[in-house]
């Protein structure tokens, strides 16, 4: 989980590793049944609430299926959960409290024997007495106030969870068998088959985060623009994966984007400013301004609330001569068809260097807009990491040119 795997992989590889250990111990003359009775499994628990519940249920089901192949039908084992590293963030870190709470709830409803809840600041600080106390209080609240310890298997019979459990079990069993067919856990790991399979899932997750299809509050969605954060706390991005799987946060690549901004701020003692220049249709200009505020806030730039103008020409003149570093055109598609080209031409006649963006994707006129001087568009399908990286490069170039 903390290296970017999905729940199916987590279960399958855990069972593959178990079978490898059992076979090794059996070859050395040890009895299998006592091993099962002393078995302890700990898994990270992520933020996909219902799927994580199903994961622990599926694990127990498949564990008993494995034990039966060794002639063990009744045994006492323990399964514990630990709140994941993958789901935690450095920016807007108090959101980690909410993630840790829902993760603990998932694990408990999945019928684990214990849950370790990390402090919300564990990923970037030595946990403070306050953060440790809050982490401990989460389990106390779930037990004493929410009565999670009073009902046995409360999710039994819930259709969605039962279906998810069945599907995860089937897929995990198929993956488990495929690894065994390759010679088992040791061979698959030594040949880096497992690492490659995890890497494929990890890259897909990171891609979805960068496209904001996998939302993470405070990271790629709803960034806290009031937050002050030191560049030293932020990641420089993911390091190349080694043969040994290394736990990491999902947010590393986006943190690196924020770090670039914070380093620039420390160098020039000024935070780059984004201006949202709105005109035309009220509903669409507000919707696109809100989207732009959220999207560009990920960068760590100072994003001004939208400014509404009577016309595209007025908006272009005023925003071109303001002290902002980035301007975003916000309006409706019909308004873009009628006025966007005028906006870009007027803007560039007053300022040839400032970053100029458009919120939306008017494909019919996009070539003409870019030829006139539009830098880029931001829209629902934009890749936040790639787009902001390009904006940062031009902003840095413009600011440093002014210093010369």
Give residue spans per PLM region.
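A structural-propensity feature for long, helix-poor, extended segments
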Residues: 135-138, 142-160, 323, 334
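Intrinsic disorder at enzyme termini
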Residues: 113, 174-272
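Long, amphipathic alpha-helical stalk/connector segments used for oligomerization, subunit docking
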Residues: 148-168, 173, 179-182, 186
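Helix-rich catalytic cores of soluble enzyme domains
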Residues: 1-106, 122-136, 389
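Short acidic/histidine-rich active-site segments
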Residues: 111-122, 148-155
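Conserved, mostly hydrophobic/aromatic
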Residues: 63, 110, 138, 157, ...
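Generic long, charged, amphipathic alpha-helical segments
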Residues: 266-267, 274-329, 339-350
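Peripheral docking tails and interdomain loops at the edges
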Residues: 341-404
